[in-house]
Amino acid sequence: MSDPVRITNPGAESLGYDSDGHEIMAVDIYVNPPRVDVFHGTPPAWSSFGNKTIWGGNEWVDDSPTRSDIEKRDKEITAYKNTLSAQQKENENKRTEAGKRLSAAIAAREKDENTLKTLRAGNADAADITRQEFRLLQAELREYGFRTEIAGYDALRLHTESRMLFADADSLRISPREARSLIEQAEKRQKDAQNADKKAADMLAEYERRKGILDTRLSELEKNGGAALAVLDAQQARLLGQQTRNDRAISEARNKLSSVTESLNTARNALTRAEQQLTQQKNTPDGKTIVSPEKFPGRSSTNHSIVVSGDPRFAGTIKITTSAVIDNRANLNYLLSHSGLDYKRNILNDRNPVVTEDVEGDKKIYNAEVAEWDKLRQRLLDARNKITSAESAVNSARNNLSARTNEQKHANDALNALLKEKENIRNQLSGINQKIAEEKRKQDELKATKDAINFTTEFLKSVSEKYGAKAEQLAREMAGQAKGKKIRNVEEALKTYEKYRADINKKINAKDRAAIAAALESVKLSDISSNLNRFSRGLGYAGKFTSLADWITEFGKAVRTENWRPLFVKTETIIAGNAATALVALVFSILTGSALGIIGYGLLMAVTGALIDESLVEKANKFWGI
């Protein structure tokens, strides 16, 4: 028959395949690995074809099997094939599950491919593309791993079918010719299985090659440090694979614990029944005597009608009652190990059967008394045997209970170890997830900052287009001087503004003031808020603003009334830390979201300059002279 098919070491993290031994070991591919559980068996010891002596191609010549031989072989083959069938069913169930995982892996791989195409088409960051490329490599390896697993299951199926045919050929009910036909079918199936072995071995070798590429790629990423998320993704995927394996193992361990617990309960019930049976045997009258003859003597008695006919003098019928009593341990032990005759002679010291002239009658009476002791002896022997058998059953049940208790302990320990491993994996995953979240936050921050800087740059270009190159230069200088500074206090700002008030007022009439105020009142706060966040990030301000609408309202009032103090006071209250950069971001946001003309632009820059640096007010004042 064929060599045994076996798949070993299902929890290993390395891959191995021996086409001669048909060994497949599970693989860690940073994801859910191919998993093939132990499947093994050896051809039965009775398997051979030497029991068929061929003559004429299809007849028995000698050593023909007996009916007993045939029935015995039938039972052996049936038991063997039942085992193979159970293994085959389990194998098919696992192949079905692997097929489902393969379908999911294919869908995931296709999704990753589409995501990568989208990133490339959208000119995404190199780090995002690198990360997605690595994800795709993982998805491709996962898919190939499940295809490899299925190939292993297919090889196992063919090997099992071959062995079933070989087993059928071993039947003693079929002719050598029929056996030969089955053997030919089995050998063909075995050849198919060997080809499947070769295919699985080649796939596993290719799997290792691809895994090596993935490992190399990961090492490069770790060494270069340029794709932290890709590395973290790989670590996360590895842990998720371990988590999936652990979850399966926990499920199996729980099933095992449930099974052994059921066996333990069965063992307890069996022990209870055995103990009840023992108690029942000990509580029978003869059982009580076996346990305590002093307390419960064993008794037997029989009425006899003995016919005497040999000697005319004593001819007739003798009516007697024979009795036997055991009331101590020594006598009980002797009777159980000797005959009734021995007991009568040696314990009762009654060796002479003839005590009167009626020889025939005396002998018959003596024999009846011996028979009474034999009768009691047999009853007590039966009782002792039943008690011994019951005690043996109790001991066996206790041993079985002890074994099942140990088995439950081991199953429980195994489950607890897996649960501990689950918690460890969960903690590691939590740490990795936090790192991924932090890395994503950093990348999002970096991306948002880049976008904000670009947004600020585009704004300055728009200032040039709308108000002229000198207006852009003024805005750039204001942004530059504001960095690292705090806004000036109210009195300083008012003093500076008063210095240039007359010049400023020469440039602005009442109509201009009304137009500027109207432009400010028409701005959309939602647009201002959105732009403010981007300008703040672009200019390096990380604080928050409060009462934005109030500030714009105060500015409009100040434009109309020429009373700037309330505005300067409000500015101190809405800007956290009094950062000058924040004020610049606010002003830029208003310029972006309003319809201010060049006069309004100059006034806004002059007022802002008074809160930052006097030189900016001077430059704003000169700006009007353009």
Curated annotation (Swiss-Prot):
Keywords: Antibiotic, Antimicrobial, Bacteriocin, Cell membrane, Membrane, Plasmid, Transmembrane, Transmembrane helix. This is Colicin-Ia. Residues 276-286 have a biased composition (Polar residues). Residues 282-385 are annotated as: Receptor-binding (R). Residues 450-626 are annotated as: Channel (C). Its main location: membrane. Residues 276-308 are annotated as: Disordered. It comes from the Bacteria. Gene3D superfamilies: Colicin, Colicin Ia, domain 1. Residues 23-225 are annotated as: Translocation (T). One of its GO terms (cellular component) is plasma membrane. The gene is cia. Belongs to the channel forming colicin family. It is a multi-pass membrane protein. This colicin is a channel-forming colicin. This class of transmembrane toxins depolarize the cytoplasmic membrane, leading to dissipation of cellular energy. It is found in: Cell membrane. The chain crosses the membrane at residues 580-594, 597-612. One of its GO terms (biological process) is defense response to Gram-negative bacterium. One of its GO terms (molecular function) is pore-forming activity.
